[in-house]
Each structure stands twice: as C-alpha cells, then as structure tokens.
Swiss-Prot record:
This is CASP-like protein 1C1. Homodimer and heterodimers. It comes from Ricinus communis (Castor bean). Residues 28-52, 101-130 are extracellular. It is found in: Cell membrane. It comes from the Eukaryota. GO terms for cellular component: plasma membrane. Its main location: membrane. Residues 1-6, 74-79, 152-163 are cytoplasmic.
Amino acid sequence: MAKAKRVFTLLLRLIAFGTALVAAIVMATSHESGSFFTVSYEAKYSDTPAFKYFVIVNAIVTVYSFLALFLPSESLLWRLVIVTDVVFTMLVTSSISAAVAVAQVGKKGNSHAGWLPICGQVPKFCDQVTGALAAAFISLITYAILLLYSIHTVLNPLLLQKT
C-alpha cells in the first residue's frame, strides 16, 4: 500500500512538473510579428507583465516539482512540502488568473476602454498563449489533487493515533 501511495504521488508530481514546464516554455516562446498597411507590430509574452509573471511562476514551480521528485518517502520534510505545495498552488492560480485576464482582452478587446482585439492580427501568438494557459490549468488541477492527497496521507495517521 505504501508503494502504491508513493507511485501515485510520483505520478502526480511528474504530471505537475511536465505541465508547468510546457506552460512556461510555450508562453516564453510565444512571439509573432505582423503589419497593417505600413505599420509593423510585434506581439511577445515579455510585452505584458502578467505573461512575464506567468512564465516566472511556472518556471519556479517546475524547479520545485523536479526537486520534490527526489525527496525520500520517509523524510520528515513532507510536512514542509505540503505547506510549499499550498503556496505554489496559490501562485499558479494567481498567475493563471492574471494571464487569462490579459488573454481575454487580447482576444475580445475592451470596447469601453477603446482596446481592440489583437488575435485577428496575431493568431499564432494567441494560440500559443491559449496552449500555455491550458497546460497551466492541467498543472493547477494536478497540484490541487496532489495537495489534497498529500494532506490526506500525511495527516491521516496523525488523526488515527490514540492519545
């Protein structure tokens, strides 16, 4: 049973690692140029602070997820890992929220502010941003499941002990 728990945890951490890595790479490589009559323009992730934040958070989560893969199952650091999982789950949530807000404005524009949508002019860029957001959502769901499972496995023996 303990081996099955370890395998399940490793599988979830591998999925979280992979999806966070994909999200960071896809967003960091999102770039497209275009022109409208004689005006040239360029869309890249680094033009938007929310997208930069998204890449940084997913890069940090990727490194953390990779390092957590090598933590021995008997280690007392797992309680600290649970706290860190909570922090990183919140960071991923905030980075996705910020990036989705900016992506929505890029896709639909904002008629009240006079902002025009840009996805018609730079569809490849918008597709890459959408792909990065999809990978990050999978990472977030995986982290939420991992967090609940970790809390259950670490705290359950403590709750069942007789005092």
